[in-house]
Amino acid sequence: MNLNSPLRTVVVTGVGATTPLGGDTASTWESLLAGRSGATALQQDWAAELPVRIAAPAAVDPTSVLPGHLARRLDRAAQFAVLAAREAWADAGFTGKAGETGGSFDAGDGTGRISAPADPYRVGSVVGTGVGGVTTLLSQYDVLRERGSRKVSPYTVPMLMPNSPAAHVGMEVDARAGVHTVVSACASGAEAIGYGIDMIRTGRADVVVAGGTEAVIVPLNLAAFGNMMAMSKRNDDPQGASRPYDKGRDGFVLGEGAGVVILEAAEHAARRGAAVYCEAVGQGLSADSYHIAQPEPTGRGIAAALEQLLATTDIRPSEIAHLNAHATSTPQGDVTELKALEKVLGDDMGHVAVSATKSMTGHLLGGAGGIETVATVLALRHRTAPPTINITELDDEVDPSLVSSRPRPLPGGNIVALNNSFGFGGHNVVLGFRVTDGQ
C-alpha cells in the first residue's frame, strides 16, 4: 500500500487474556462482571519480611499449560504473552501461521474457516512490557551467586530481554511486517496497541498481534514499590486493598498476566468474512515532562492525550459512553484523571460509565493496557460496563453518577469506549474504540 494513501480503518477481530481473574478471556470477563478480586495474601517465605505481602498472581500458572520445552526457554512475562496471543489468534479465526494458506483465505478443509493471513510480511507483532524478564534476571543471579557461573542458563539473555515477548509472539504467527516492543512503564501495553493500530492505518501491515504483558511479583519489586509508598499495605484485606475512588485508597495491588488483541484492516477482515468486535479508532499520546514517578497534578498531559485522539480521529465527545480508567487506587492519580477528562469533555462526561477494573485485577504495570483493552472491547461487545469494587465511601471529588459497584448497561447505537493508561516517566495514552449499531 502507498503510504500516502488515506488512512485505513482498523478493527478488532480477536481477544486473548490470562489474568489474576482467569486463564482465558471468558473466565476473566465473567469474574469482572461478578466483581471478583484476584488479590490474595502471599504465602511464600520471602514475603514475611516485606512491607507489602499481598498481590494478584495469575489464576493459571503458564507452565501448567505450555509445553515444558517451550516454558523452560521463556521468561514468565513471555509465557503470559504467548498464551494470550494464542487465544486471540484462534479467536480471530486463524488456525495456522501466516503464509500457511498459500495465498488463499480458505482453510481448505471444507468448513470455510480461515487458516491464516496469506502473506507473513503483512503481519506484525507489538507487545509492551514495563520491566521485561526480571524473574529470569533475579533467578539466574541467584544461580550465579549460589552455584557458580557454569550453572547459569545459556538462555538467560534471550529470556530477560524486554523484546522477548514480542519476538516469541511474532514467531508464533510468523509475523514479518515488524516485531516491536514498547517500554513505557505502565502505559506500555496500551501504547503497543496504539502502535499496532498505526501500523495498519498507514499500510505497513494488514494484521497485528498487539498487547501487553508483565510478571514482576518478586521480592525486589514488592519492596521497592512498597518503599515508594505506591502500593497498598492492607495486608489483612487483600481483596479489599485495591479501591479506586474510595476515600481510604492507599495504593495499588501488583498483578501479573497479559492481554492481547488481533488488530486487522477492515477490508482484510471483510474479505475473509471475519467476525468483528469493534473498530479500533486510534490513539492519543502525550508526555508530562514533570517527574519520573509522580503524576503531573493538573492532569494537563492526560487532557492533551484525549484532545489529540479527538483531533486525529472522527470520534465525537457525545459518542463516548464508557471509560476503562487507569485508576490505580492512588490518592492523587484517580481524581486527577477524571478531572482532566472533564476539562476536555465538559457536559459529555456526565454520560460516561467509568470502570476501574484494577479494583479486581490489580495493576499489571506494562500488561495493564493489554488486559484493560480486552475488557474495553468486551464491554462494547456486550454493551456492559464492568463494576468498580471496594468503594466503601466515595471520594468527595468524584461524581457518583460516573462509577458504580454493579455492571451497567451501555446504550445502543454507535458508541465509543476509551481506555486510559499512564506510566512512570509521564507517558499518557488514550485509546478509542467504537461499536456500531447492530454489532
Spans of features found by a protein language model:
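Flexible, low-complexity linker/loop segments at domain and module junctions
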Residues: 1-12, 106-119, 313-319, 350, ...
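Active-site-adjacent elements of ketosynthase-type condensing enzymes
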Residues: 47, 51-57, 136, 215-242, ...
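ACP-dependent fatty acid/polyketide chain-elongation machinery
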Residues: 1-70, 92, 267-279, 374-388, ...
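Condensing-enzyme catalytic core mediating Claisen C-C bond formation in acyl metabolism
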Residues: 9-13, 40, 236-313, 321-322, ...
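Phosphate/pyrophosphate-binding loops at sites that engage ATP/ADP/AMP, CoA/4′-phosphopantetheine
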Residues: 88-119, 269-276, 305-322, 344-348
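Conserved catalytic cysteine-centered active-site region
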Residues: 2-7, 41-89, 122, 132-195, ...
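Glycine-/small-residue-rich "gating" segment that lines the acyl/pantetheine channel
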Residues: 146-153, 191-194, 198, 215-271, ...
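Short, well-ordered amphipathic alpha-helical segments that serve as non-catalytic structural scaffolds
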Residues: 81-92, 165, 192, 265, ...
